[in-house]
């Protein structure tokens, strides 16, 4: 997954990580995780896997110097 793909996924979920601090992004991720977690809604298993992959890519971009 590319960084652009990760941004696109979160934008579709109404989260705009490119305009957030890392702390704000983490809070937004946890809100999504509570909403789409497979234990809460089994039909969202694949979506949650994509959210987790996108989160990993975006967090790596926060760690890299610009």
Which residues fall in each region the model found?
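N-terminal J-domain/J-like co-chaperone modules of DnaJ/Hsp40 proteins
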Residues: 1-43, 50-65
């Amino acid at each position: 997954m590319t960084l652009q793909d990760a941004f696109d996924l979160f934008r579709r979920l109404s989260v705009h990580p490119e305009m957030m601090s890392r702390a704000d992004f983490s809070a937004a991720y946890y809100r999504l995780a509570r909403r789409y977690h497979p234990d809460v809604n089994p039909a969202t298993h694949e979506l949650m896997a994509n959210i987790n992959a996108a989160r990993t890519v975006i967090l790596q971009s926060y760690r890299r110097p610009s």
